[in-house]
């Protein structure tokens, strides 16, 4: 039974844990924070998480995927950092817009307040006004949730690297939080690189020492260090680092590279990071309940079968652009005790029949994920054609649904079928701009934060494949799009092609799901939504699970 507090029993302070990074970026702070959160939940605590992003963008919604990676959409429609996807998957809970704080959001709020006269004529400065706004957003994560439950622990990851000029207001705010709520209610974890020099055969501790010195110079004394390395850090080196960085030996944790990100909680558990933190913060706890996670790790490390899943996309040079899609595919594989090997396929390589045959010939299943713009679109449509003709299981997501509809429309005699996104003057726009998106598309309104975002309900056709996969006919999925199936062409496409419009918005206006009759194709399903955002490693999403099951069934048939 959870020891979480409610608003009627609020005697114990919410504890705040801050995770910072040093030496280099991309150390895995987000995964470390999420893994610690999972561990604390396994000990019966209520945990929520937050990402503090130093960039000046209000959110990543308008950022190039090559710049930022995936944009993760929350239930309430916030476009956030991809680390929130890790948080949701590891904690198995939905987060909100409040879980992602950017410099852009903070400055926008402070400047708007100044314009309204909220500072009563005072000079607005980084300290205290910007830091106060950051602190308010951090402390607000400790408020009761919609069920009246107050979290036991809030874990806040500070993006960037200690020493970055952009991170300074966030680190100063974190320092002030510790001062305000009491040191007994606050815990700092610093992730640092311990590089291995092959020429000398040594692990070097000096970068970590310098990084901690930089952190201490701004008033933050780390309580624990997570040492990132490509191998185990010996106890002697951990003792040396503890001495030189003035950290308890029990608080120096080795976290080497691992085959699967889902083994990180187990690594931190064996290093006793959770027990050290619980002891320091005087948290109530129980023995770790590993039941669900151990079953997951057994499936991760002991697959019984293997399939290859191709992802046909525009941004495949940066796999992080499709991070949640990859994790959803892997989770579906775990559910079926199957290793899923991911093959990255550039959509431009599939434009011709010969190119599609070369690029797609060795895959057992295909996923066509979301994206924007005309580049590579004909390759995605050609990939749909190849999958349809060769009966390869295919799942289309967002833009993937639109490609499936365009391909079916061309089968139905609409040879010029396309989307107004790719050709605003299209003669046969089977995909068109949503009415409420016209202003943004025409440049008369902001692009950022104006798409159809967040969770929306859909009604599935009784007896359809998607209804069978979900097990229900009323579902809810997250969205991020401006374009929709043009209802003027629905009847013609439905009558002249095997495509079935198997799910719509409750009012029947928006097409949300399409599929092919199973007599025509074993598994060709697409959704306007982004179901990958709701997948969990311990609970595969039904659509991805269905894709993997179809690929396994096809492999048995072929054998």
Swiss-Prot record:
Glutamine amidotransferase type-1 domain location is: 308-557
Q: InterPro entries, per this entry?
A: Class_I_gatase-like, CTP_synthase, CTP_synthase_N, GATASE, GATase1_CTP_Synthase, P-loop_NTPase
Q: Matching CDD domains, A to Z?
A: CTPS_N, GATase1_CTP_Synthase
Record region (Amidoligase domain): 1-283
One GO molecular-function entry: glutaminase activity
Listed EC numbers: 6.3.4.2
Residues binding UTP are: 25, 204-209, 240
How's its activity regulated?
Answer: Allosterically activated by GTP, when glutamine is the substrate; GTP has no effect on the reaction when ammonia is the substrate. The allosteric effector GTP functions by stabilizing the protein conformation that binds the tetrahedral intermediate(s) formed during glutamine hydrolysis. Inhibited by the product CTP, via allosteric rather than competitive inhibition.
Q: Which GO terms describe its biological process?
A: 'de novo' CTP biosynthetic process; pyrimidine nucleobase biosynthetic process
Please state what class of enzyme this protein is: ligase
Asked whether the keyword Metal-binding is assigned, the reply is yes
Q: Which Pfam families would you find in this protein's record?
A: CTP_synth_N, GATase
The pathway this protein participates in, as annotated, is: Pyrimidine metabolism; CTP biosynthesis via de novo pathway; CTP from UDP: step 2/2
Q: What positions does the entry give for CTP binding?
A: 25, 164-166, 204-209, 240
Where does the chain bind L-glutamine? 371, 399-402, 421, 482
Listed binding positions for Mg(2+) are 83, 157
Under the heading PANTHER family, the entry gives: CTP SYNTHASE, CTP SYNTHASE-RELATED
Q: How does it assemble?
A: Homotetramer.
As for what it does, the entry says: Catalyzes the ATP-dependent amination of UTP to CTP with either L-glutamine or ammonia as the source of nitrogen. Regulates intracellular CTP levels through interactions with the four ribonucleotide triphosphates.
Q: What is this protein called?
A: CTP synthase
């Amino acid at each position: 039974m959870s020891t979480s507090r409610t608003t009627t029993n609020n005697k114990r302070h919410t504890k705040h844990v801050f995770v910072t990074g040093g030496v280099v970026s991309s150390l895995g702070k987000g995964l470390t924070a999420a893994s610690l959160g999972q561990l604390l939940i396994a000990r019966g605590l209520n945990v929520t998480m937050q990402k503090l992003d130093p960039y000046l963008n209000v959110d990543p919604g308008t950022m190039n995927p090559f710049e930022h990676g995936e944009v993760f959409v929350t239930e309430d429609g916030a476009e956030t950092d991809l680390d929130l996807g890790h948080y949701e998957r590891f904690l198995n809970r939905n987060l909100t817009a409040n879980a992602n704080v950017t410099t852009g959001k903070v400055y926008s709020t402070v400047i708007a307040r100044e314009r309204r006269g909220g500072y009563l004529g005072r000079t607005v400065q980084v300290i205290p006004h910007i830091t106060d706004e950051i602190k308010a957003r951090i402390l607000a994560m400790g408020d009761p949730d919609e069920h009246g439950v107050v979290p036991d622990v809030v874990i806040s990851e500070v993006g960037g690297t200690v020493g970055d000029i952009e991170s300074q207001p966030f680190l100063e705010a974190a320092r002030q939080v510790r001062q305000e709520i009491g040191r007994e209610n606050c815990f700092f974890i610093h992730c640092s690189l311990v590089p291995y020099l092959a020429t000398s055969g040594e692990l070097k501790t000096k970068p970590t020492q310098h990084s901690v010195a930089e952190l201490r110079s701004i008033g933050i004394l780390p309580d624990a260090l997570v040492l990132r390395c490509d191998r185990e850090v010996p106890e002697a080196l951990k003792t040396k680092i503890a001495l030189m960085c003035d950290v308890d030996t029990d608080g120096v944790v080795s976290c080497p590279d691992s085959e699967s990100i889902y083994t990180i909680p187990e690594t931190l558990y064996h290093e006793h990071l959770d027990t050290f933190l619980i002891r320091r913060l005087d948290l109530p706890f129980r023995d770790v309940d590993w039941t669900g996670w151990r079953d997951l790790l057994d499936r991760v490390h002991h697959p019984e079968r293997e399939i290859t899943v191709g992802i046909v996309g525009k941004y495949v040079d940066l796999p992080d652009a499709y991070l949640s899609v990859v994790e959803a595919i892997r989770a579906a594989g775990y559910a079926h005790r199957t290793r899923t090997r991911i093959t990255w396929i550039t959509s431009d390589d599939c434009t011709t029949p010969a190119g599609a045959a070369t690029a797609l010939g060795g895959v057992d299943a295909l996923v066509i994920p979301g994206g924007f713009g005309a580049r590579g679109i004909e390759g995605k449509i050609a990939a749909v054609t190849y999958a349809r003709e060769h009966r390869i299981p295919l799942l289309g997501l967002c833009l993937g649904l639109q490609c499936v509809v365009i391909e079916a429309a061309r089968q139905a005699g609409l040879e010029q079928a396309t989307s107004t996104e790719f050709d605003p003057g299209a003669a046969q726009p089977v995909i068109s701009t949503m009415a409420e998106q016209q202003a943004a598309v025409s440049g008369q309104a902001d692009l950022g934060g104006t798409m159809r975002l967040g969770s929306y309900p859909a009604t599935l056709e009784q007896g359809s494949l998607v209804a069978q996969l979900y097990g229900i006919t009323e579902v809810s999925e997250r969205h991020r799009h401006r374009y929709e199936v043009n209802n003027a062409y629905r009847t013609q496409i439905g009558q002249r092609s095997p495509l079935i419009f198997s799910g719509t918005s409750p009012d029947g206006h928006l097409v949300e799901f399409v599929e092919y009759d199973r007599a025509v194709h074993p598994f060709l399903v697409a959704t306007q939504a982004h179901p990958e955002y709701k997948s969990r490693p311990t609970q595969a999403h039904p659509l991805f699970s269905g894709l993997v099951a179809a690929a396994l069934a096809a492999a048995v048939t072929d054998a």
